[in-house]
């Protein structure tokens, strides 16, 4: 199957699979979909609460986005829904601009994702450096962790306390630590212990579901004074309904930055999840179709009252381990959650808030990637470590928009510095090598000078062109460009200045082995016509021979 094809992979599976193959696989996908729904249920509720919205909105997201992305997506096994990466972003948007702002930002993100897919930009995600993704992921993990301490300890804040930013949350924690509720701590610790130890008991039943059941049972059984979801939220059961909030052009303009952030994060998370899944099932996803599906799924989610969604690595891994191999598993997972929403959602009111906090603490720990973080700090270059730490810090102190923007800017600057340092300009008068261009030792006439440029000629290194000099007796200057893969406008300007310098000193300029892109740039700039087509020689031997011939003709003419 073509990786860059803009066609849902489900359609290709149905078209190219035999009836016998489908008959064997579909039952496995149905079972896997049910298992994944069990995993997704507590996570969807917990992540919705962490995002500052109602618990049922997490299920809306898993149902609508989960179904649409599975149906239209480019991955066989991707499971999409609310993820921890979006929690802090969504919470900030909802706190400042309400659900209308979130809808506007997500629609912007959805349109961007669809366009990215249709324009086949899926492969561009690989240009986001590992240091940036590691830094902001660890930063998000810290913000989630800080945000759950209040509920884990059962703290009580005075009315009007603002806790949107991480720094505000830390200040509020310090100011109200004396209000700790030890009964809430007990529930939270028990649930954390279950989450850590349950995988040793059973890998089939998710520990988060067991923690929810045990936590919900502890509060009434022991008469504990602990806040539950029902104490803080109004639970709404029933089918999600299509909503069209009033959105103004000004609101879309205000939410543009948030929309771009959601789109970038959704693209990175979803395609990373696809890559991880591909490595397990030995398959290949269609990155561009996956982006289109993510865009449609996100727009559908918010129009049905949900929040942004993306591919969830943990749920996708659960799908793979359970035998899911087609998008039918993701669609079944959404259908099962829909049944839970309609018939069992009122029971979610019994879940204690410390249980939700415990689940999110485990999510934060798992997504932090602290081992990779520490490994990078110990082994990466100083520039890479600086980018990592700065992205991490800015994510916590400010927001993801600032972190990614600054991180990418620093990465680009460091990359240009590295490339410019690798570009060299060196002169020679006698040179020998054994490459395919050279078959003999080069002896240069005294009046011929050669400079060799190795590396891309762009604005980061053009100052080195000014280091080229000629002697009083120099008549011909050969610029060997076989090691120049690319030439930009600033590099072109440097060559024009070099030409003027040579003209002022009575020196003829010759170019040797200009590669395709630099040659095309010089032609477009009119530089080839200025210097003369005959002065561009195919290799260094030909250039030296041309200079020698010109010198001989000048001597005869004299």
Segment roles from a protein language model:
Residues 530-546:
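Short acidic-hydrophobic, aromatic-tinged amphipathic segments that line or gate anion-handling sites
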